[in-house]
Amino acid sequence: MSLADSVLAVNNDLPIRTDKPVHSGKVRSVYWLTDTDSRRLIRDKGYDVPEDTPLAIMVISDRISAFDCIFHGEGDLQGIPGKGAALNAISNHWFGLFAENGLADSHILDIPHPFVWIVQKARPIKVEAICRQYITGSMWRAYSKGERVFCGITLPEGLSKDQKLPELLITPSTKGILTGIPGVPAQDDVNISRSDIEANYQAFGFEKPQDIDLYETLLKQGFKVISDALAKLDQVFVDTKFEFGYVNDKNGQSKLIYMDEVGTPDSSRIWDGAAYREGKIVENSKEGFRQFLLNHFDDADILLNKDRMPEREALARDNDLPLDAMMNVSRTYIGVAEKVTGSSIPLPANPKADIIKVLREQYDLIV
């Protein structure tokens, strides 16, 4: 089989039994199971959730998105070899470490395959929970233009690009387009302040005001667990994005949990520690791919200017990226995953066929 065959690019066409539309995100697709199948799996697999909890199959792809677009490579390479398996392996490892440290639960109930999670339905918080330990990226771009207030936080004078911040900062943004919130534009990924959340906590999905403190605590705790573990590997945990939601426990009590992925090269910046001490930035995250794109195309403003989105979409659609650039990303993702987990990352030759086989034989979910 060719390299392209080993990439799972389309993940929303699996013959999984469902009575609802498949939700297709940039990287993952979600198949909501029937009530009958959800109840059967909860009973037969012994999942520690109420018997009427809706379950879903979440399938990751190898697609790569940057600047809100999906990119592809030469030779009909529609994704990054090993990327999906690497991302899931990293998240699985961190969620396990969270459990060992007594942090909150995640939405994951079972891992049938390197590309697949069985998850419980959650009521999502509509906040991208971003934590920053270093000034770089969008924060540095704003700071270098003279802005000193970022997400309601006043930054000190005299900061330099890529330096460690005096303290860990929480700089949230909106998750999805939210309407009717005073002072918050109805756009995706808009920076917001803690005071915005406090004044409109229900609009952001919080069930009670005290949970704002809880989400910040869980964010800081999760950041510290990952940062401490990466430091032992001489890697710098620069910044990251977490997501949270509510589920009910077996007693019907609502609880806040971690959702989506955590501490991955997609959701975080990770720098090589040795290089950083020498004054250089070596990216072990998707940021390296973003920088490649900014240098690869003649007009980088297309990638940065939200008013040029149609041009950006055409740029991504009409350009095959060099194979070596795609494989560099593959090596980065697999390398980080193997460092973090201490294990090799299995790369199926035909991931779609493998997923169908497992879900048919072990879960009876294939039609």
Swiss-Prot record:
CDD domains: SAICAR_synt_Sc (cd01414). Belongs to the SAICAR synthetase family. It comes from the Bacteria. It catalyses: 5-amino-1-(5-phospho-D-ribosyl)imidazole-4-carboxylate + L-aspartate + ATP = (2S)-2-[5-amino-1-(5-phospho-beta-D-ribosyl)imidazole-4-carboxamido]succinate + ADP + phosphate + 2 H(+). InterPro entries: SAICAR_synt/ADE2_N, SAICAR_synthase_Vibrio-typ, SAICAR_synthetase_CS. Its EC number is 6.3.2.6. The keyword S-adenosyl-L-methionine does not apply. It is an enzyme of class 6 (ligase). GO terms for cellular component: cytoplasm. GO terms for biological process: 'de novo' IMP biosynthetic process. The keyword Iron-sulfur does not apply. Pathway: Purine metabolism; IMP biosynthesis via de novo pathway; 5-amino-1-(5-phospho-D-ribosyl)imidazole-4-carboxamide from 5-amino-1-(5-phospho-D-ribosyl)imidazole-4-carboxylate: step 1/2. This is Phosphoribosylaminoimidazole-succinocarboxamide synthase. One of its GO terms (molecular function) is phosphoribosylaminoimidazolesuccinocarboxamide synthase activity. Keywords: ATP-binding, Ligase, Nucleotide-binding, Purine biosynthesis.
